[in-house]
Each structure stands twice: as C-alpha cells, then as structure tokens.
Amino acid sequence: AFIDEYTGQKNLELLAGLKQLISASDIHNTLQAVGLDPNDKRTFKKYSLGMKQRLGIAAALMEKPDLLILDEPTNALDEQGVAMIAQLIRKECQCGALVVVACHDADFVQSVSDVVIQIQAGRVTSVIGK
C-alpha cells in the first residue's frame, strides 16, 4: 500500500529504505521506465488510476526480482501504458526474470508470453506454448 500524502518518489524511497538495497538512482530510473516523472510533486492521492497502477508496477520492478507476479497489470492504463508494460515485461524476461501475468486481456497475454495457461472456473482448460 502507498501513503496518500507522499509523492510517488517518496513512496518508493520509503519502500526502498525497508530493503536497503535500492539506490535513489534505481528509483529515479524505475519511475521513468514506467512513464512517471520522478520530479512530479503531486501526492499519491492525486494520482489517476493509471498513475497508481504504474507506481505499483514500479515498486515491484525496482527490486529487480527473479520472479515477478503481475495481477491485471494493464488495468486503468491507456494504449501507450499497455505497450509500455508489455515492453517492460519482455525486458525483464530477457534479463532472466520469470514473469507470471494474470490478465483477462488474451491478446496482451499472448503478446508477452512464452506459455499461456487458460483457467476457467478454477480449472486449467488449455496450455499453449510458443
């Protein structure tokens, strides 16, 4: 969860402080990578839904995880934001991360996935690999 009265930058700095492994430069670069301005002085509560979504993704990315689990990462994003998320997912995979995406947008999932597992009513209904 993010603190409403803090900027996106300050929220990420707070999270980074808990890990003590993430530099100010990493935070700055991650905010830029998700399309947020690191110098934006607006507080989190004034962010649009799309900006909040981007900040959540930035929080996950800044840790440079080996496993990244994204639940509906395209929610509240415009076309440009969806393309940016797809590019970031591909980049993470190229860097060796395993990325798991849960999403109702089948076209998006297929565009970023090596393997697509379709689940309906709690059961696997198909597995498609590239």
Regions found by a protein language model. Name each.
Residues 64:
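Conserved catalytic motifs of ABC-family nucleotide-binding domains
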Residues 6-18:
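Q-loop/switch helix immediately C-terminal to the Walker
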Residues 68-72:
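Catalytic Walker B motif of ABC-type/P-loop ATPase nucleotide-binding domains
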